[in-house]
From Swiss-Prot:
It comes from Saccharomyces cerevisiae (strain ATCC 204508 / S288c). GO terms for cellular component: cellular bud neck; cytoplasm; mating projection tip. Serine/threonine protein kinase involved in a signal transduction pathway that plays a role in yeast cell morphogenesis and cell growth. This pathway seems to start by SMP3; then involve the kinase PKC1 that may act on this kinase. BCK1 probably phosphorylates MKK1 and MKK2 which themselves phosphorylate the MPK1 kinase. Residues 967-977 have a biased composition (Acidic residues). ATP binds at residues 1181-1189, 1204. It is an enzyme of class 2 (transferase). Keywords: ATP-binding, Cytoplasm, Kinase, Nucleotide-binding, Phosphoprotein, Serine/threonine-protein kinase, Transferase, Tyrosine-protein kinase. The modification Phosphothreonine is found at residue 407. This is Serine/threonine-protein kinase BCK1/SLK1/SSP31. It is found in: Cytoplasm.
Length: 1478
């Protein structure tokens, strides 16, 4: 059925002369009362001529040019335009001149010519004269429930979509919510392959047209609003016209004529003279406040929406047309005076004055009513009052006196008034002609058995449509049944039906459907129950009844029932509780609830709970022992909200496979869960909310945000029938929060397979699966495995093939236990080295150092099956690389090394390891390990050799015990010299690039992929927590995790330093120091002798060993690890709450990469500022409005930063999107360059290099307030006050600088562990000279947090939009969910912009907000921005006053964040230690 059928392809162009009627169309031809198909036996042409003659008789001043033939010739066009069967009223205002259509219709004498002229005035050569740009729908296209299947197909036809699309949407019932959800491509992609893609049928066109339909209808809706306000005046003017016509015409003709007001506004069919036309238009001057004919047309049409009838009633039917319609039998309600007129019913197919007009101009029900019953409802009052006091007369209905008979607004039908004596026959004819087919007897009627109004005895509220054939009962939940009259001695039993789609007007159909409701032959008496019952008939023997206990207390106990699920009820004795607090505690104890975040509600069996009971009301009920109540109390656990049943999978009727774009099951594996994009995080608050409908809840209007994909692994042990949403997550988190603890698998003692004295070569035995469960454990001295270092062991290199290829190092000169490492390598590619170890252990003379007792044991030993890696590629898309899979870097090198060594038939090994008082991980002999060359006393690292071409990467270690290495260092940063000299070794660059690419693209898909297997319990606990940005301390301790592509032990030169001193050499060889590096491929590494002076210094440029006196002057060098550790110590020693970050504006920036040696220039200018900064990029920690955000280390100062980068392709000058992104980044830089405030994320510097724009930001640990809300739940009011005050201070500072943020939301507020809240993400901020002036700006930001003036782009806006957004944030913190959580994006946008309404406060949240908090929200949600307070004014609001005793670190939220940070750190350590086999 056409939505708004184009008049094209039929050789008839829609004529402007009948445009007033062409936009009114009837309803379903099989059921509508005002059907377009008349059952009259007379020819249609004759009927039209007769109608036209009657019109001429009533209007004698018609122009002579308007002939009967002309009207007859134009009628087919009218009929065609009327032959539409949609139930929608559509007005199209395209009229250009108010007189052009009248004059053109009567321009010539011949009909076709006038019709042609009329076409020309209809818009020239336009195919569709009804302009889509000015289309107005009487129903709301933004409401998914309004999109019925009929409207969907009509919309497709109107926009020329192919029939295959229409059939597919019909076949799979894609309407309502399912139709609107197709706006999102993820939902549309499921069906796209089944729909043919053409120029006129594509997703892009479908989305644009659907959005345009929604937008245009709201944009033009102001016309409907204006017409609604003028409805009363227009009706009065039409009444005056009728009164004039009544004086000149007979009562019979007037009763049969169509609405005079419509004739006055649509004079083109009868063609009156200009004088009459002016008179008619003058009577409707209330609609003509503008000179625009288009506005006149639309307003007239809307105000007279009900005045149009079906196409058969486009002209009046005179009384001289005789139709053979049988006389209607006399109803016993009628008086004798009414029989005479009803014996000869009028012949008009529709009567315009029977039914009451619906007063809502924009209601979809009014258009539906007009389609069913014609127009002019309630226009004429009956000539004399109805004698029945309780009858449904149109007068009573119009005055609103019979409210009990009003139907529900959702009902598809509207009741008519009881016909008067003049109208009964006419109404009977309507019903008869519509139901002539299959009617056995047209004379069958139903007798109403009471002289009063029929009483309704059904339990449900019903509304009765009283007609002469039957009583049609329509359920009306909003209305109550009328009282039963006391004088009524008989009643008609009514059976209410639900959702009756059509009126079956025949008595036969009523008999078949409701055999007990309609009886034309006899009356139905009121059932009288004469049977008498006695109480004794129901009494049982006394022994079956319960016996009351006899106790010491004579007073009776009073019990109520409490429940937490409305299923299981527990009795609670009110006598045992005296105070309200004890009552609550007893109730919570009975139900097993261990917190007080609950609300109390009244309930009963098979009932829904009532509203939350305030404390004062609950106190009153307790004192009154819950009298006049059900005695049942429902306690709603706010920490564990009711969970919805999981909806059935979305399937179509013909089982079309609906594949999800992102497979949720693929997230179950430990590897692929890391690769999931964090774009899902934005689903909660961002533009993809179009797809966030609950399919099964669309009827009730409940909609929640879609759960991000990475949450699906969180509750893998929950009931599979439950839906995964935020409440599931919060439920699990609440239990963990109540008892925060970390449970790790304990690890057995690290066993060292020590060699026998007589063995030549001993290979360490891998630790088994049961032994590899690592955790914190202190290694104690094992008496049976002690090594006697007084007896030298035999060298494993006595075999010829294992003979050393270079000179052995000198033996240690002192007796202190030192560990040195000797690695050997044959550089020929054929003779490769097989890694093997032989372990010796020093004799201990004292217990382990204290730091080892608290530090984790690094157990990185592995079996061949435990192919694990310390870092998972492609894990940079999450806030923290999670989970940090793997344990041994030896495994990570397996694939690359085997590629280069698989052709070698013989593997050779040469390695020597001396052990001191430290625990050392052993390496399995069949794997190759990297080549660290220098190991120091306290490090716990894997030590082995590998090929020269191998690429060095750090092992999975923690530096928790690293600080003692700097105890001997000077306090000055520049004083550290040779103690940090590292013998470096270059790696092969091409192989590095290839391996990096392989790691990034392989996704662990090869046979030796890096995987780690956790048991489900451990994995769930770890992944659930790893969602916040770690603190800088955690990053400093785990640099290799967050900077996986950096060489942390690469020496960085700081400049010329003094010659090496013995003291620095001692510190270099001190067991407290930890460092490792790599050497040149052509340079064999050489251990450092453990004495105070050594003989050689390595020169990495020429690869030769030079004596000390011939070496170049040594330079001060530090490793990145050293610099970071110094910064970590300085941070710990800092006592300032606000730690200052070094700003780098206007300073040269140098990025540290692994491809070249970087020299740190610490020279300062006259202002004491560094002239140059070196920085290093790490893992991705988030995505902002533009580009990605990475972790960043300021190598010059050691500070942790964040860098936002936008990469611009080389040839992107024509790409507007990229240009706008770069421009936004430049704007962000210029706007925020000079900002410095505690509650604003600092911007530290900017760099543009190699088409990459880098913006350096302050690093804020913790997480956003939005993510905390989603994981933790709603906040307490003192905490909300604490955060709101900080945000207000930041906003006041921004506004004082003339900056509008324009995208304030909880996700853009960062909260660290110290409770400091910072405003971030200024990607769309704007700098303005006058921030409080309503300047014309574009709509930016996220819809749900937008102020009304931002959505209404015609109205400018100011900095007050940030105040509105702040109110949304406060509401979000109170409610635990985003504002407008029950609406999707499009609906919320129109709700804000059109209705100018603030987001509603959820019912369960309202009791939790104090009166001061409500006042604060009301101030923020002031619709008029002029009256909305500024940030400084809100700082003086009582809500902004934070209690002095408030301590953020003592709140549960702070403990929650801290436990997450500890768990993150522990997770990093565990993954470095844990080796599990499959």
């Amino acid at each position: 059925m056409p939505f708004l059928r184009k008049i094209a392809g039929t050789a008839h162009t829609h004529s402007r002369s009948d445009s007033n009627s062409s936009v009114k169309f009837g309803h379903q031809p099989t059921s509508s009362v005002a059907s377009t198909k008349s059952s009259s036996k007379s020819p249609r042409a004759t009927s039209r001529k007769s109608i036209y003659d009657d019109i001429r008789s009533q209007f004698p001043n018609l122009t002579p040019n308007s002939t009967s033939s002309q009207f007859y010739e134009s009628t087919p066009v009218i009929e065609q335009s009327f032959n539409w069967t949609t139930d929608d009223h559509i007005s199209a205002g395209t009229l250009e001149n108010p007189t052009s259509f009248t004059n053109s219709s009567y321009k010539n004498d011949n009909g076709p010519s006038s019709l042609s002229d009329s076409r020309k005035s209809s818009g020239g050569n336009s195919v569709n004269s009804l302009s889509f740009d000015k289309l107005i729908l009487s129903w709301d296209p933004t409401d998914p429930d309004e999109w019925t299947m009929h409207r969907v197909t009509s919309w497709f036809k109107f926009h020329d979509f192919p029939e295959s699309w229409i059939l597919f949407f019909k076949k799979h019932q894609l309407f309502g919510h399912r139709f609107i959800k197709l706006l999102a491509y993820d939902n549309f992609a499921v069906y796209e392959k089944y729909l043919p893609q053409t120029k006129t049928a594509s997703y892009t066109r479908f989305q644009q047209l659907l959005k345009k339909t929604m937008t245009k209808n709201v944009t033009n809706s102001h016309i409907r609003q204006k017409s609604a306000s003028k409805l009363k005046s227009s009706r009065s003017s039409s009444e005056s016209i009728k009164s004039k016509l009544k004086n000149s015409k007979s009562q019979e003709d007037i009763s049969n004529s169509r609405s005079t007001s419509e004739s006055a506004l649509s004079p083109t069919k009868s063609g009156p003279s200009k004088t009459d036309e002016k008179n008619f238009l003058h009577s409707t001057s209330t609609h003509q406040k503008t000179k625009s004919a288009s506005s006149l047309y639309r307003r007239s049409f809307i105000s007279l929406r009900g005045s149009s009838s079906s196409n058969a009633s486009s002209a009046k039917s005179p009384s001289n047309i005789k139709l053979s319609i049988p006389a209607r039998p006399h109803s016993i309600i009628e008086s004798n005076s009414t029989l005479t007129k009803s014996a000869s019913p009028p012949a008009s197919p529709s009567y315009p004055s029977i039914f009451r007009r619906h007063h809502k101009s924009s209601s979809s029900e009014s258009s539906l009513l007009n389609s069913l019953f014609g127009s002019g409802i309630g226009e004429e009052a009956p000539t004399k009052p109805n004698p029945q006091g309780h009858s449904l007369s149109s007068e009573n209905l119009a005055k609103g006196k019979s409210k009990h008979y009003e139907t529900n607004v959702s009902s598809p039908l509207k009741q008519s008034s009881l016909p008067t004596s003049d109208d009964k026959g006419n109404l009977w004819n309507k019903f008869k002609r519509k139901s002539q087919i299959g009617v056995p007897s047209p004379n069958t009627v139903a007798y109403v058995t009471s002289q009063e109004t029929p009483s309704l005895k059904s339990n449900s509220s019903t509304a009765t449509l009283t007609v002469q054939t039957a009583d049609v009962n329509i359920p009306s939940p909003s209305s109550s049944p009328p009282p039963i009259p006391k004088t009524a001695n008989r009643s008609l039993e009514v059976i209410s039906t639900e959702d009756t789609p059509k009126i079956s007007s025949t008595t036969a159909s009523f008999k078949e459907t409701y055999p007990d409701c309609i009886n034309p032959d006899k009356t139905v008496p009121v059932p009288v129950n004469n049977q008498k019952y006695s109480v004794k008939n129901f009494l049982l023997d006394q022994k079956f009844y319960p016996l009351k206990k006899t106790g010491l207390n004579d007073s009776e106990n009073k019990y109520i029932l409490v429940t937490k699920d409305n299923v299981s009820f527990v009795p609670l004795n009110l006598k045992s509780v005296a105070k309200l607090s004890s009552f609550k505690e007893s109730a919570l104890t009975k139900l097993g609830i261990n917190h007080k975040n609950v609300t109390f509600h009244m309930t009963d069996f098979d009932c829904d709970i009532g509203a939350a009971i305030p404390d004062d009301t609950l106190e009153f009920l307790k004192k009154s022992l819950f009298l006049n109540t059900s005695g049942k109390i429902y306690i709603k656990d706010q920490m564990k909200l009711q969970q919805k049943p999981k909806p059935a999978p979305l399937t179509s009727e013909n089982n079309v496979p609906l594949k999800s774009v992102k497979s949720k099951s693929s997230m179950r594996s430990g590897t692929s869960s890391l690769i999931a994009s964090t774009d899902d995080v934005s689903i909660v608050t961002s533009s993809s909310d179009i797809t966030s409908f609950d399919e099964h809840a669309s009827g009730s209007g409940r909609r929640y945000p879609q759960t991000p994909s990475y949450y699906y692994d969180r509750v893998s042990n929950t009931n599979p029938t439950e839906e995964l949403n935020y409440w599931n997550i919060k439920e699990v988190l609440s239990h963990e929060e109540n008892a925060p603890k970390m449970v790790f698998k304990t690890s057995p003692k690290l066993e060292l397979n020590l060699p026998d004295k007589g063995s030549k070569l001993n290979i360490p035995t891998p630790i088994t699966e049961n032994e590899s469960k690592s955790s914190f454990q202190v290694l104690r001295k094992d008496e049976g495995t002690e090594i006697d270092f007084n007896h030298r062991r035999e060298s494993p290199y006595t075999k010829p093939e294992l003979a050393p290829k270079r000179e052995a190092p000198k033996p240690p000169a002192n007796t202190s236990p030192q560990r040195t490492l000797s690695t050997s390598k044959q550089n020929k590619p054929i003779r490769l080295v097989r890694a093997s170890t032989k372990i010796s252990r020093s004799k201990r003379s004292k217990p382990l150092p204290p730091q080892l007792l608290s530090s984790p044991i690094e157990a990185s030993s592995s079996s061949p099956d435990s192919l694990t890696s310390s870092y998972t590629p492609a894990s940079t898309h999450v806030l923290i690389p999670q989970p940090y899979k793997g344990a041994n870097d030896v495994m990570r090198r397996l694939k690359t090394d085997q590629d280069s060594t698989s052709t070698s038939p013989s593997l050779k090994m040469k390695q020597k390891v001396n052990r001191s008082n430290s625990t050392v991980s052993t390496s399995n002999s069949i794997f190759y390990s990297p080549s660290p060359l220098l190991k120091r006393g306290n490090s716990k690292r894997v030590v082995s050799s590998t090929s020269a071409a191998d690429i060095f990467e750090e092992n999975d270690i923690t530096f928790a015990d690293a600080p003692p290495m700097f105890d001997s260092d000077d306090s000055d940063d520049d004083s550290s010299s040779s103690d940090d000299i590292i013998w470096s070794k270059k790696k092969t660059a091409p192989e590095t690039n290839n391996e990096n690419k392989k790691d990034e693209k392989s996704d662990n898909s090869s046979t030796h992929s890096d995987e780690i297997f956790y048991d489900s319990q451990t994995q769930d606990k770890m992944e659930r927590k790893m969602t916040f940005r770690p603190s800088p301390e955690v990053v400093y301790q785990n640099l290799e995790k967050f900077f996986p592509r950096a060489n942390l032990d690469k020496p960085i030169t700081e400049g010329i330093a003094s010659p090496t001193s013995p003291k620095s050499l001692d510190s270099l060889l001190s067991p407290k120091n930890v460092a490792s590096s790599r050497t040149e491929p052509s340079t064999p590494s050489r251990p450092v002798p453990p004495d105070s002076s050594y003989e050689f210094i390595q020169d990495g440029l020429n690869g030769k060993n030079k004596p000390l006196n011939q070496a170049k002057t040594p330079k001060r060098t530090k490793t990145i690890r050293t610099i970071a550790h110094e910064a970590s110590l300085a941070r710990k020693n800092s006592v300032k709450l606000k730690r200052q970050n070094t700003k780098m504006w206007g300073t040269r920036m140098v990025e540290v990469t692994e491809n070249h040696m970087v020299s740190i220039n610490k020279a300062k200018n006259s202002k004491g500022e560094y002239k140059e900064f070196a920085w290093m990029k790490g893992e991705m920690i988030g995505k902002g409005s533009f580009g990605a955000v990475y972790l960043c280390l300021n190598v010059t100062t050691g500070e942790m930063m964040a860098v936002k980068q936008v990469e611009v392709p080389k040839y992107s000058s024509q790409n507007e999107a990229i240009l706008s992104t770069v421009e936004a980044l430049r704007s962000e830089v210029s706007t925020l360059k000079d900002l410095d405030h505690l509650n604003i994320v600092q911007y530290l510097g900017f760099e543009n290099k190699n088409n990459i724009y880098s913006l350096f930001l302050e690093y804020v640990a913790g997480g956003s307030v939005g993510s905390l809300i989603r994981m933790y739940g709603r906040f307490d009011e003192p905490l909300i006050k604490h955060l709101t005050t900080q945000v207000l201070k930041g906003l006041a500072y921004l506004h004082s600088k003339g900056i509008l943020h324009r995208d304030m939301k909880a996700d853009n507020l960062l909260l660290d562990q110290d409770g400091i809240c910072k405003i971030s993400d200024f990607g769309i901020s704007r700098k303005s000279k006058d921030i409080y002036s309503n300047s014309d700006m574009t709509m930016r930001g996220t819809v749900f947090w937008m102020a009304p003036e931002m959505v209404d782009t015609k109205q400018g806006y100011s900095a007050k939009v940030d105040i509105w957004s702040l109110g949304c944030i406060v509401l979000e913190m109170f409610a635990g969910k985003r504002p407008w959580s029950n609406l999707e994006v499009v609906a919320a946008m129109f709700k804000i912009g059109k209705s100018k309404s603030a987001p509603p406060i959820p019912e369960d949240t309202l009791p939790l907000i104090s009166q001061i908090g409500r006042n604060f929200l009301d101030a923020c949600f002031e619709i008029n921005p002029e009256k909305r307070p500024t940030a400084n004014e809100l700082l003086s609001h009582p809500f902004s006053e934070v209690n002095e005793t408030f301590n953020f670190k003592s709140t549960r939220l702070a403990k929650f964040i801290k436990s997450n940070d500890k768990l993150n750190s522990s997770k990093l350590r565990i993954t470095s230690q844990e080796n599990k086999t499959e």
